[in-house]
Amino acid sequence: MAVSMREVDAVFQGAGQKDGLEIWRIEKLQAVPVPKESHGRFFTGDSYVILKTTALKNGSFRHDIHYWLGKDTSQDEAGTAAIKTVELDAALGGRAVQYREVQGNETERFLSYFKPCIIPEEGGIASGFRHTEINEREHVTRLFVCRGKHTVHVKEVPFARSSLNHDDIFILDTKSKIFQFNGSNSSIQERAKALEVVQYLKDSNHEGKCDVGSVEDGKLMADADAGEFWGLFGGFAPLPRKTFSDLNGKDSAFSSKLICLNKGQTVPVDFDVLTRELLDSTKCYLLDCGSEIYVWMGRETPLEERKRAGSAAEELLREVNRPKSHIVRLMEGFETVIFRSKFSKWPKKADAVVSDESRGKVAALLKRQGFNVKGLAKAAPVKEEPQPQIDCTGNLQVWRVNGTEKTFLSFSEQCKFYSGDCYIFQYSYPGEEGEECLIGTWFGKKSVQDEKTTAISVASKMVESLKFQAVMVRLYEGKEPAEFFSIFQNLVIFKGGVSTGYKKFVSENGIEDDTYSENGVALFRVQGSGPENMQAIQVDTAATSLNSSYCYVLHDGDTLFTWIGNLSSSMDQELAERQLDVIKPNLQSRMLKEGSEYDQFWKLLGVKSEYPSQKIAKDQESDPHLFSCTFSKGVLKVREIFNFTQDDLMTEDVFILDCHSCVFVWVGQRVDTKMRAQALSVGEKFLELDILMENSSQETPVYVITEGSEPQFFTRFFTWDSAKSAMHGNSFERRLSIVKDGVKPKLDKPKRRPTTSSSHTGRSSVPEKSQRSRSMSFSPDRVRVRGRSPAFNALAANFENPNARNLSTPPPAIRKPSPKSPSSDPTKPPQRAASIAAISASFERPRPTLIPKSIKASPDVNKPQVEASKPKPEANGKDSTPSKDSPTVTPTIQEDLKEGQPENEEGLPVYPYERLRTSSINPVTDIDVTKRETYLSAAEFRERFGMTKEAFAKLPKWKQNRLKIALQLF
């Protein structure tokens, strides 16, 4: 039900429009804004409304509203705060989650807004207390108790020995010194977090200038700080063993109760199993879980009904005498994960992408019919491709798993994967602190379980041999992150497999082996973001495998087609041309535009049928969530840390950072060996539990990262200081050194990163990364000759300089001198180089075109293409073919070769450019639409393309297509 803004306090208009905090204090039953400089300062006699607005990656805002009640606040102010919270939610569109916060028992989410803590001050508006400024009052010795491993709850207690106990941590703030007393039963992590409160008191109460002392429970007068501390209490005396904590754990035995609110009346709802179907959109409900009460408000309920529901929850707490229980109010459709987890069945949220899918289908349909869909296609929101966060100039080594062994792949084979196999890769690259290393496993969709187990075991041993200073990642085909594709740059994934495990599995189960064959029929989908991030993936040889948003390569023996989808980009088309050099380097491809296919093309695909037009959806990176973990006997328990920072990563613990598209398991240096070995299992168990109820895939990438070896694609989620993860000691010792000395301790940085170990490779070196980059990517200015002989390709590969290095990598510390011939003269170019130049020049002569330009493309492709066009003589009668001694000139877009030579007319009619354009309002009919440029006159061709037709013909096919696309002739 729509809510009128007349029912909402005007002070809330415009709230929640930017990331950050907004706070209002209740003064005379009205909400009054609190200035930003006073945020985090609360008074025990007041009530507040706090709005936390978070900007999400999808461009929207998430709103969390809290109303905080001081222990001395009046009942009227508390009630007003609750009502104003409902009004603020209405002003925000009814999407916020609302929390009731009681002084001393605040939620961890609320406390995370005011790190490291909040310490309410005496005073209040209604009570008449005077708000004294810090610099107006004299220092009074105060004692605080601190509880919490990840978020600190601070409470002031009487300054007396009887307040101390063995379970908690206490901070004594005196005029000249701050003491931290660590109870013997407190953890290292709790002590480290309490030190953040010490730092806060030092900065706020002492202007950062006072001594800090640490006192360990059980240490007597021998310690100077301990002696001084106990002296303030009148001397040392034993503390009682058992103490009662007013922050006891939640009652796990409490049986949940569901109560329906109908016209001001409360009606219990009986149920055997709590399901979503019990909730009606026209009503409000209370779900009493003991330590918290949830108020669920149906979308169709009026504002007054929602206010009454909040009051009913407050009344329920008074009746059952649970004043410290939390109240969480939620609107239908915006329920929290914790609330949904209370139900045995909760429907999954559907992704709202129907409009984009429909738009793509309509655009593809119209384009097939010859309409210009440029505007329609652009109307769809473009999802940015994730950018790789890794240096791509490193050294790569790859192994294929064969049964229980691994087989090293040569440089030419390391980027050719099979879907039935498992692979292990090791990638060393320059990082911010030195060389970094990534060791990963890749599982094909049809790989066998035994080889997956072997891959994980071998990769784990490789990481262990490098003293856990390498990052480990487990990947599945189809779920690879951007970093993986950037490392491999030009990846081809074939069907089937060649490993012993796959072959054995196929044989034993009587399954047809569909392993790729060069002479068979195969269809590849080409994808990627650029020449150094492109993939060709073999798909089923069927029309249903096509997609209007991609380009495809289809071959059957010596027949080769390139299919261009109507919604594909010019970059997609360029990548398809480049992939031909990998899949079929010695064949000439026939380019087919969607809607202009040959009959033979459809015959190879079986039968013509419908196919999709929308790009294949990828898991999008969402806003990260950090969880602390405990894992024992196969049981994983997690606790979310809100508004996290690097300081939340404790060296004694294991944490999970969930970004939806991938999961990072961070392992502290002081984690025990057993837990460290189970890190990958922790990540897999986390995915299995689906903690955030996002329908996470078990094949989501899982990274295992050891403290001190954090890569940039992990640290980008934090404001990162690499020095912190390289500090001495445990969490408490590190923080104490900073608090006491005011500076960071001396660092002991490990040598990052270990060089490639020959024990895993069977060789002592790997190809230089510059060599790797050259062989896996192509310069856009390089003219590549399609169909040149394998002999020339091999010769060119052998003569590439393997010693040329990318400048981003330092040269080896020691370089052995190469042996020189006694007769060599360093001042003269070697004869070998001259010989290579001569041989290369002879190989680079322009090859005759396979299809004569005078013949139009015909659907009948079964006729042998044996006729070749002969070189035309120049005007002076000389043959235009260069001699062996003449250098080969490579034409570029701006060059105009042989300007004085008459144009080679092809016997075709000449039409003006405006009628040949694909978007022409008066298009020419009965022409070969794949060669629109050939119908231009020589003069207009030169005007439009900036070169002659001969120069254009000598360009690589992909460059020709790019020019034609730019001129709307493609």
Curated annotation (Swiss-Prot):
Gene3D superfamilies: Severin (3.40.20.10), Villin headpiece domain (1.10.950.10). Gelsolin-like repeats lie at residues 31-111, 151-219, 273-339, 416-484, 536-576, 643-714. GO terms for cellular component: actin filament bundle; cytoplasm. The keyword Transport does not apply. InterPro entries: ADF-H/Gelsolin-like_dom_sf, Gelsolin-like_dom, Gelsolin-like_dom_sf, Villin/Gelsolin, Villin_headpiece, Villin_headpiece_dom_sf. Residues 755-778, 878-893 have a biased composition (Polar residues). Signal peptide: none annotated. Keywords: Actin capping, Actin-binding, Calcium, Cytoplasm, Cytoskeleton, Repeat. Residues 833-842 have a biased composition (Low complexity). Residues 741-908 are annotated as: Disordered. GO terms for biological process: actin filament capping; actin filament organization; actin filament severing; response to calcium ion. PANTHER family: VILLIN, VILLIN-3. This is Villin-3. It comes from Oryza sativa subsp. japonica. The gene is VLN3.
